[in-house]
A protein has these predicted regions:
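NAD(P)-cofactor binding segment of oxidoreductase domains
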Residues: 4-42, 70-73
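Conserved Rossmann-fold NAD(P)-dependent oxidoreductase catalytic core, especially the SDR/UDP-sugar
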Residues: 27-63
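Short-chain dehydrogenase/reductase
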Residues: 53-73, 111-116, 144
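Conserved beta-loop-beta element that borders a ligand/cofactor-binding pocket
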Residues: 73-93
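Substrate-positioning beta->alpha
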Residues: 96-99, 106-129, 135
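Mid/C-terminal beta-alpha module of Rossmann-like enzyme folds, strongest
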Residues: 122-176
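C-terminal amphipathic/interface module of NAD(P)-dependent oxidoreductases
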Residues: 173-211
């Protein structure tokens, strides 16, 4: 996949970078052509922080954070304007608790997780590319919840009698306990969420995922 990326772009283009960290980072091959780069990073860079907003420091010691932070800093130091977005857990049609729960691939607990619907993330990304805003911002919807709460919600939508137990040998995808406030970037870009909560986003995701 990476070898298919363009290495020569017309001057002045605006680039959305959402690839996971690689060495060397593919953005380095673009030279000075881009006028702007928007990078989709992750809230994992905040490590064990339980309350996150645009002023929360990153965790430099986190093994998951270091590769992402290296890419963030490389982009921020480039000869272009840049904006770093750090999305919370991304869900949508074919992706999310509503998909993993019936397979027994979801661990319900009392840890908090913030989320963002893929359509809302796309709105953020488009607005970010078209703006001149710079800096670093977390991205999330308005309703963090525990992994148990969302599992129970999905179980009701799917007409499951109860939350299925995880399949033997499966491991929780995340053990983080993090509530993310994404209001600062929405204000800065002047955008509103289509799905302010998983309560509205997951039913729509199930509808479109079944098509």
């Amino acid at each position: 996949m990476l070898h298919d990326l363009p290495t020569h772009l017309q001057a002045g283009v605006r680039v959305l970078h959402s690839l996971p960290p690689t060495a060397p980072d593919p953005i380095a091959a673009l030279g000075t052509a881009p006028a702007r780069v928007v990078y989709l990073s992750t809230t994992a860079v905040y490590g064990s922080a339980t309350q996150v907003d645009s002023s929360t420091p990153v965790d430099e010691q986190s093994g998951r954070a270091r590769p992402r932070l290296a890419v963030e800093r490389s982009i921020a130091a480039g000869p272009w304007s840049s904006l770093i977005l750090r999305p919370a857990a991304i869900y949508g049609p074919g992706r999310g608790v509503q998909e993993s729960l019936p397979r027994g691939a979801y661990h319900a607990g009392d840890n908090y997780v913030s989320r963002i619907h893929v359509d809302d993330l796309a709105t953020h990304a488009e607005a970010a590319l078209l703006s001149d805003l710079e800096g670093v911002y977390p991205v999330a919807d308005e309703e963090p919840c525990t992994t148990r709460e969302i599992a129970e919600f999905c179980a009701r939508l799917l007409n499951l009698p109860n939350v299925p137990q995880p399949a033997p040998g499966t491991q929780p995808r995340t053990t983080s306990n993090r509530r993310v406030d994404g209001s600062a970037i929405r204000r800065a870009l002047g955008i509103a969420l289509l799905y302010p909560s998983y309560r509205t986003g997951i039913p729509v995701s199930l509808k479109f995922g079944a098509q």
